[in-house]
Amino acid sequence: MRKNLSGLIFCTDMGFAGNPEEAGSDRTYSLDTLPQEVPSSGVGDYRDDMVRIRQVDGSCAADFRFDSYEILDHSYAVPGMPALYDTEEEKGETLVITMKEKASGVVLKLFYGVFENENVITRAARLENHGETAIELEKMLSFSMDLMYENYEVIYFSGRHAMERTAERIPVQHAKVEIGSTRGTSSHHYNPAVILCEEGAG
């Protein structure tokens, strides 16, 4: 199992890719080509954003930067949402990473629940407006995951009456794939869940 993926990051001249001010003239450093934990719009990362806020002046750039972290000796819970909870057999741990957006004062907290015995990591996110003006939240995902390129496949489930959850399998390519239901709820037509696996995994 890989523990440190930094050796897989290929740094080369990324001409015409956006560079943050801190990179100076280093054209090998671009938010558009490096793995991101929180991709956001307006800062040189052109992938789909995880968080999109609109400020009172109409701007939607959001530059979330690491601020602090905390390790809790219990699992986290999100009110009204399903979750894994501490039991007598296993007590989870939680890593909370706090990121701040300097211009707006918005704080993004990332929660990582770890259940080591079950080999499970859960993720949630919470946005807090600590600024002096209102913001409009246009988009908020609980997580975004950049994976280094390998031969992955996506398994998802479509169906119809009396033939629910028919497994479909497609290779991951340079394309956008959306999994979801347009009925307003999950159903026998579509189950909004995905399995990401290595090519040919059974």
What are these regions (language model features)?
Residues 1-202:
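Polysaccharide-binding surfaces and accessory modules of carbohydrate-active proteins
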